[in-house]
Structure formats: C-alpha cells, structure tokens
Design a protein with these regions (language model features):
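Extracytoplasmic/secreted envelope proteins and their assembly/folding machinery
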Residues: 30, 34, 59-62, 89, ...
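Non-membrane alpha-helical structural segments and their capping/turn regions in soluble enzymes
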Residues: 23, 27, 102, 157-164
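Active-site-adjacent substrate-binding region
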Residues: 97-123
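Catalytic-core regions of hydrolytic enzymes
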Residues: 2-89, 94-99
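Short, low-complexity, charged amphipathic interaction modules
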Residues: 180-201
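Sec-exported extracytoplasmic/periplasmic mature domains
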Residues: 31-42, 66-70, 109-117, 168, ...
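Surface-exposed patches in mature extracellular/periplasmic domains of secreted proteins
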Residues: 45-50, 118-125
Length: 201
C-alpha cells in the first residue's frame, strides 16, 4: 500500500507547545514510523512541508498525497487544551463509511489505551482540510495532549519509538518486532548468573 505520511506541522510553522513541543516530538515519531511501515512492505510518500503558514503546510501535504495517488493519507499530531486538562488519544476521519479506516483508528486508540492513554475514540469531520482535500481515505492521529502532565509523562517513558510502534501496529494490524536489548556490561551478566545459581544473596 502507498501511504502519504505527514509528521504534523512544519518547522517553520510550529504547532502546539506545552510541556512538549508538538512539532519537534511528532517529527521524531514520524522518523521512527517510516522504516517500520516500509519494513512491513508499504511505500511511504513524504508529505511534510516547510511552509511558514498553516494553509501552506496543509495544502502542500494533501497535494503531495494526491499527486502521488496514495492509497491512504495519515497525519500525526499532538493535541492541547486550555489549562492542560485534556488527555488521551483520538483519530479523526471524514466519516464512518470506510470500514478499513474505522478499524485502523480503533486499533490505534486501543494500542494507546493499553499503555495508559485515555481512549477518546473515533472523531468525524467533513471540514478539516486533511480529511476533505485528500482524494483518498485520510486520518488525523492526535496521539496525546502535549500540555497534559499524565500524557507527557507516559510519552517520556514510552518514547517516540514506542509511540511509532503503536501507530504502525494499528495501521498494519500486526505487532511490530521489538528490538532485543543486549547487555554489554560483563559485571551485570556475571551477577545475574550468580544470583540464578544462588551464589549471591
């Protein structure tokens, strides 16, 4: 499948800034997500923009997706709310008519919920540019609230790579293989073996 992917806002047109900088962190998630989807066999079209205004970056993103005849267009964001009280994950779709997109949205929301994020469910809008100006099924993923203490603490624990894994799994319907952690410190290995043998209290 050919997926048009945009990692949120342009470096020249910042998004929300709270405890986390949406633009900076979402770009980390994007950079981790691309190779995961490629490894799963998908072609990724970079729909990011360097525009210095919102209309410019939105238009450039959907234009790239349309010009490349993508099968799906996905943009990644972080949310924000007054006073930092909002929390959780939500996925926006044009409407509820596409079963595939509904399923992907539900899987993504469930993956985030399993890690402690609030599940805000599927949302629908016919007025959001990414959803109405794209000629293919599209989705806006609001991963979390960048100004909420709970959400940002989870993010610091999970990391951009972990967030990307949850999105990739939601899109593909398959678990993303975890990288094995290699213990390189010999002392740690020796102590572990001794403890298993009962030689160390």
């Amino acid at each position: 499948m050919k997926i048009g992917l945009r990692g949120g806002h342009s470096p020249n047109c910042k998004g929300a800034i709270g405890i986390l900088d949406e633009q900076a962190e979402v770009r980390k998630i994007y950079n981790a997500l691309v190779p995961m989807l490629q490894k799963a066999g998908h072609t990724i079209i970079d729909c990011n923009s360097k525009s210095d205004n919102v209309n410019g970056e939105l238009t450039e993103g959907t234009n790239k997706a349309n010009e490349n005849a993508c099968d799906m267009y996905i943009t990644i964001h972080m949310n924000a709310s007054s006073g930092g009280v909002g929390n959780g994950t939500e996925c926006w779709l044009y409407n509820g008519d596409n079963d595939v997109m509904n399923t992907i949205a539900d899987r993504i929301n469930s993956n985030f919920a399993a890690e402690g994020y609030g599940n805000r469910g599927r949302k629908y809008s016919t007025g959001l540019h990414d959803l109405c100006a794209s000629s293919m099924p599209a989705m806006i993923i609001e991963t979390m609230f960048c100004d909420n203490t709970h959400d940002t603490e989870l993010y610091k624990k999970i990391g951009a790579n972990g967030i990307a894994e949850m999105i990739a799994s939601g899109i593909t319907g398959k678990a993303v293989p975890k990288k094995q952690k290699v213990i390189t410190h010999c002392k740690e290995v020796v102590l572990k073996n001794l403890k298993e043998r009962g030689s160390v209290p």
